[in-house]
Amino acid sequence: MADPARAAKLAQRIKVVVAEALGRKVKDPRLEGITVTDARVTNDLQHATIYYTVFGDQVVQADAAKGLEKAKGVLRQEVGRNITVRLTPTLEFVADQIPVNASNLEELLRAAKKRDAEVAALAAGAKHAGDADPYKSDIPEDVEIDEDDFDEEDEDLIDDEELDEDGNK
């Protein structure tokens, strides 16, 4: 097993080598619009997965996948010449889903922004169901309010026989 840091460095080198080889060595017109986005190498340095994107419809993407499979031998040979490992890793090409995920995310954000604008428009013309401030009191601030239930002033109002020994009714 190789060091994970070494595998990461090798993956970056393979990414660069494959991208350059696609531009210089491979003359397939199906591979002209390919962008290599990432590469990953297993810790034993035997297998490399290369992620790519192609802008276009499904037909263009399918053609690019076929072109990469056809050029896999040439690309592996170029990788073997430009890296310093005993065994050249096998190459696997995987279409990267980042552009698809990004466009889906942008569509969701657009829909959320539209809903927020609709809610804001409805809220602008809405009225409160009750008072604007339900905790607002009509009693002036300088008037003292007797907030407790029972105190000494209230004892004078009640007959002594109605109270028990604790002063309760």
UniProtKB/Swiss-Prot annotation:
Region named Disordered: 124-169
Subcellular location: Cytoplasm
Domain of life (superkingdom): Bacteria
Biased composition (Acidic residues): 140-169
UniProt GO molecular function: ribosomal small subunit binding
GO biological process: maturation of SSU-rRNA
Chief location: cytoplasm
UniProt-listed SUPFAM superfamilies: Ribosome-binding factor A, RbfA
GO cellular component: cytosol
Biased composition (Basic and acidic residues): 128-139
InterPro entries noted in UniProt: KH_dom-like_a/b, RbfA, RbfA_dom_sf, Ribosome-bd_factorA_CS
Sorted UniProt keywords: Cytoplasm, Ribosome biogenesis
Family: Belongs to the RbfA family.
PANTHER family (alphabetical): RIBOSOME-BINDING FACTOR A, CHLOROPLASTIC-RELATED
Quaternary structure (record): Monomer. Binds 30S ribosomal subunits, but not 50S ribosomal subunits or 70S ribosomes.
Protein's job: One of several proteins that assist in the late maturation steps of the functional core of the 30S ribosomal subunit. Associates with free 30S ribosomal subunits (but not with 30S subunits that are part of 70S ribosomes or polysomes). Required for efficient processing of 16S rRNA. May interact with the 5'-terminal helix region of 16S rRNA.
Protein name: Ribosome-binding factor A
Gene source species: Arthrobacter sp. (strain FB24)
